[in-house]
């Protein structure tokens, strides 16, 4: 975009202006009948250029501009109104493709330039241009370079201009009290390109500030360069509500200061409804995207609710079904008939006693008398089957059993839990009762046959006794533990101290060992202190003697 130096002469500005007007004139010659409109536009542009040159200040940091004198107001207003009327009548300028975003124009923040050097379409069309008089590339350089206009007239709406060389990660407007530093294009971006001709243009001079520093309190207080077109501060022509700001771009994050500023500065009754139209890129820059968390109901939260609902529906359906009583049998028919007589004869009021009396009388009846009631019961069943063909006794009894299960299930669960806890937490020495009081904890057989046979004092078995089978008579409740005793004896014989244990047992006990059984207790099977505990228990235990019954070889 051609720029003017602060000290540039009128001749240089005139030459540039004439060249650009010539280009625009060639482009506008394609549509006939626009000569008068072209002349009016040229007059307005030249007057604007003269104003900007006359009112430019010498300071580089000046960002405000005073409105033009009162004498030129009427003249410029007439020019612009006439130009606007002719543009609308001739339909020379088309409406913007994105009509719903009047406050901030969002360009494609990344990738302004195509590989061939031309400007991308998204960068060309990022501004709304209902009336592109002030936004055309030919006149952009003719504005005051020291105090560039922050806003263009887009359908008479003040729009903050986004500079071409803003960094992609820079937010659209920085709300701070500090001024922007003089901007230079970053290294990864090529110089600015004229969107009409494709010719690279010199960037903004380093001594010029292409931005307006906007603070939360300063928006709406900066004097507009075209003050004769903008209404006063208290009466904005077009207002922008927060909803209109956010609606076309829901991913834009607007902080609290911005929302309060917009809602307080502008009234929401004059803004046209925004259209649902996205930018050409369709994807906002990640630097200005606010994270949106979608809350989706999980399946785990839904399934229990559905399960309970289905159960409730089934229960309601069951309750809606009428309760059908089963047909009465012969005894019930007799009770129904004779109950009133028994109640009248007896002074008893308890139903159990009355039922007992009726039962005795029923059994005292003869077969012929009972046959009458059996016949009545058969007819009752036939009538019931005709009235309720699909009924079965399981319908009633199933409900009762179901109710009982529901009532008993928590009790049974607690009962089984307490049982398991008792078994788990019993100590090892108290897991079995004492042998004197417990019948099932004791065997009438020696603990280890090897211990009895290995003792020198024990009588040697003869050949006939060895050949004959040995029958051990045990108590009935102890037979189940016989195999366990043999396995325990085998383990005891395999232990390294079995020989010493057998000798120790045989010396004090001697031959009476066969007449005294050794009980199989948990203390004997315990790994620690196996044999001393058994020796301590031997004198205390008195049980029935072991009877050895031998069979003859015949």
Swiss-Prot record:
Stretches of the chain forming a coiled coil according to its record: none
Keywords recorded for this protein, A-Z: Activator, Cytoplasm, Developmental protein, DNA-binding, Nucleus, Phosphoprotein, Repressor, Transcription, Transcription regulation, Wnt signaling pathway
Bias (Gly residues): 1-11
Gene Ontology CC annotation, any one: chromatin
Residue ranges of the region described as Interaction with CTNNB1-A: 1-61
Chief localization: cytoplasm
InterPro entries, per database record: Catenin-bd_sf, CTNNB1-bd_N, HMG_box_dom, HMG_box_dom_sf, TCF/LEF
Pfam families xref list: CTNNB1_binding, HMG_box
Region spans: Disordered: 1-73, 183-213, 391-475
GO biological process: canonical Wnt signaling pathway; negative regulation of transcription by RNA polymerase II; regulation of transcription by RNA polymerase II
Bias (Basic and acidic residues): 17-32, 52-73, 407-416
Function: Participates in the Wnt signaling pathway. Binds to DNA and acts as a repressor in the absence of ctnnb1-A and possibly ctnnb1-B, and as an activator in the presence of these proteins. Required early in development for the establishment of the dorsal body axis in response to maternal Wnt signaling. Also required during development of the CNS for the establishment of dorsal-ventral patterning in the prospective diencephalon.
Family statement drawn from the similarity comment of this UniProt entry: Belongs to the TCF/LEF family.
Protein name, as recorded: Transcription factor 7-like 1-A
Organism: Xenopus laevis (African clawed frog)
């Amino acid at each position: 975009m051609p720029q003017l130096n602060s000290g540039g002469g009128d001749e240089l500005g005139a030459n540039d202006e004439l060249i650009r007007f010539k280009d625009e004139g060639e482009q506008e010659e394609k549509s006939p009948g626009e000569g008068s409109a072209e002349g009016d536009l040229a007059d307005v542009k030249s007057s604007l250029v003269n104003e900007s040159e006359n009112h430019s200040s010498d300071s580089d940091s000046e960002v405000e501009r005073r409105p033009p004198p009162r004498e030129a107001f009427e003249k410029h207003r007439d020019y612009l109104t006439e130009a606007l009327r002719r543009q609308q009548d001739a339909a020379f300028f088309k409406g913007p493709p994105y009509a719903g975003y009047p406050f901030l124009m969002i360009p494609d923040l990344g990738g302004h330039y195509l590989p061939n050097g031309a400007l991308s379409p998204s960068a060309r069309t990022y501004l709304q241009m209902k009336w592109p008089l002030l936004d055309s590339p030919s006149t952009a350089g003719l504005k005051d370079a020291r105090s560039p206009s922050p806003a263009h007239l887009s359908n008479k709406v003040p729009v903050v201009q986004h500079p071409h060389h803003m960094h992609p990660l820079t937010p659209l407007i920085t709300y701070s009290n500090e001024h922007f530093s003089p901007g230079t294009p970053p290294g990864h971006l090529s110089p600015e390109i004229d969107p009409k001709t494709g010719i690279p243009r010199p960037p903004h001079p380093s001594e010029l500030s292409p931005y307006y520093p906007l603070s939360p309190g300063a928006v709406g207080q900066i004097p507009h360069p075209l003050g004769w077109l903008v209404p006063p501060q208290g009466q904005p022509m077009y207002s922008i509500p927060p909803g209109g700001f956010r609606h076309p771009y829901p991913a834009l994050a607007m902080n609290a200061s911005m929302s309060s500023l917009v809602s307080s500065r502008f009234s929401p009754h004059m803004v046209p409804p925004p259209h649902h139209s996205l930018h050409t890129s369709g994807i906002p820059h990640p630097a200005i995207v606010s994270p949106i968390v979608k809350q989706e109901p999980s399946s785990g939260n839904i399934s229990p609710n559905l399960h309970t609902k289905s159960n409730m529906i089934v229960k309601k359906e069951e309750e809606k079904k009428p309760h059908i009583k089963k047909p009465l049998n012969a005894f019930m028919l007799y009770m129904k008939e004779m109950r009133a007589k028994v109640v009248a004869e007896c002074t008893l009021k308890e139903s159990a006693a009355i039922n007992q009396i009726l039962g005795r009388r029923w059994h005292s009846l003869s077969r012929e008398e009972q046959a009458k009631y059996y016949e009545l019961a058969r007819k009752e069943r036939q009538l019931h089957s005709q009235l309720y063909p699909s009924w079965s006794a399981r319908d009633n009894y199933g409900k009762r059993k179901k109710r009982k299960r529901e009532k008993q299930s928590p009790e049974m669960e607690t009962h089984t839990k307490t049982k398991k806890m008792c078994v788990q937490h019993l100590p090892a020495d108290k897991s079995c009762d004492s042998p004197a009081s417990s019948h099932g904890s004791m065997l009438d057989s020696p603990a280890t046959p090897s211990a009895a046979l290995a003792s020198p004092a024990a009588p040697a078995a003869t050949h006939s006794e060895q050949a004959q089978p040995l029958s051990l008579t045990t108590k009935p409740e102890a037979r189940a533990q016989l195999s366990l005793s043999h396995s325990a004896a085998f383990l005891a014989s395999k232990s390294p101290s079995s020989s010493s244990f057998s000798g120790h047992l045989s010396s004090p006990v001697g031959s009476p060992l066969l007449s005294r059984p050794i009980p199989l207790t948990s203390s004997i099977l315990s790994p620690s202190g196996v044999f001393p505990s058994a020796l301590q228990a031997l004198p205390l235990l008195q049980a029935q003697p072991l009877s050895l019954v031998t069979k003859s070889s015949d």
